[in-house]
From Swiss-Prot:
It holds the Pfam family Coq4. It comes from Bombyx mori (Silk moth). This is Ubiquinone biosynthesis protein COQ4 homolog, mitochondrial. Its cofactor is Zn(2+). The keyword Cell division does not apply. Zn(2+) binds at residues 162-163, 166, 178. Component of a multi-subunit COQ enzyme complex.
Length: 259
């Protein structure tokens, strides 16, 4: 069983049940397959090639163009997404994710409740990260160019847990933190977009950050990507109450930075 020991407080138990009920009831309103069908845009090989070239150029010129980065990830990531899907099928936890297809947004996650959980819980770490960095869980674009609903969900899941990976690794949202997380994700998911982001993003680092990156962050990211459990197959929503130190130990993550 992948669930870990809950925090032994009645208040926390009530909070956890509310979070899970809220998540389940919202997810029941519309299936992911229905949403995917509404968002899907069919493309041929020529159109995919144009999208690949265009999105890559624009993303390089302006790393803040999330729409172009998302597009690039979809049109270049087919083999990597199939790999991610196969990795998720290898564990009970990953299978549960693929079966339930949970979503992470402001309608499915009670962030106010998470923010009241014990300080060292995964849920609190995530809520504090989102608040401190002024991030909304609704900022992740829907998948548009992947025809297979199962693979489309895997890509959607990758996007929606990205901030959770940031938070659980204690990585900031600045360029240094983003590049570091991209390397961890790239090693684990094999997504060309992540690997490219790690390479090209590093070229944009300022001298001081570049020195820190080469000496500390890059070696740590490579070790973490190779040694940690497959983070895309972790059912974070069922672990809100888990102590972050216990989470790191279970995931085989050696912390680079303190919270």
């Amino acid at each position: 069983m992948y669930l870990r020991k809950p925090i032994q407080k009645i208040k926390s138990e009530v909070q956890i049940r509310l979070i899970r009920y809220y998540t389940a009831s919202e997810n029941a309103k519309v299936t992911y397959h229905e949403e995917m069908q509404n968002n899907f845009i069919a493309t041929n090989i020529f159109q995919k090639a144009l999208l690949t070239c265009g999105s890559a150029v624009i993303a390089l010129l302006d790393p803040h163009r999330g729409d172009m980065i998302a597009c690039l990830g979809e049109v270049t990531g087919e083999n990597a997404i199939k790999y991610m899907h196969s990795k998720m099928l290898q564990t009970e936890e990953g299978q549960d994710i693929l079966k339930n297809k949970p979503r992470i947004n402001s309608k499915t996650i009670a962030f106010e409740t998470l923010s009241q959980m014990p300080e060292n819980s995964l849920g609190r770490v995530y809520a504090d990260f989102m608040k401190d960095n002024n991030i909304t869980a609704d900022s992740r674009l829907p998948v548009q160019f992947i025809a297979d609903p199962e693979l489309a969900y895997v890509m959607q899941r990758y996007r929606e847990v990205h901030d959770l990976v940031h938070a659980s690794l204690f990585m900031k949202t600045n360029m240094l933190g983003e590049v570091t997380v991209k390397w961890v994700e790239g090693i684990q998911t094999k997504l060309p977009m992540c690997i490219g982001g790690g390479i090209w993003g590093a070229a944009r680092l300022r001298p001081k950050h570049r020195q820190m990156y080469l000496k500390y962050y890059l070696p740590w990211a490579i070790r973490t990507g190779n040694n940690a459990k497959f983070l895309q197959g972790i059912y974070f929503e069922k672990r809100w109450e888990q102590d972050i130190d216990d989470f790191h130990k279970e995931m085989n993550i050696v912390r680079l930075l303190k919270k």
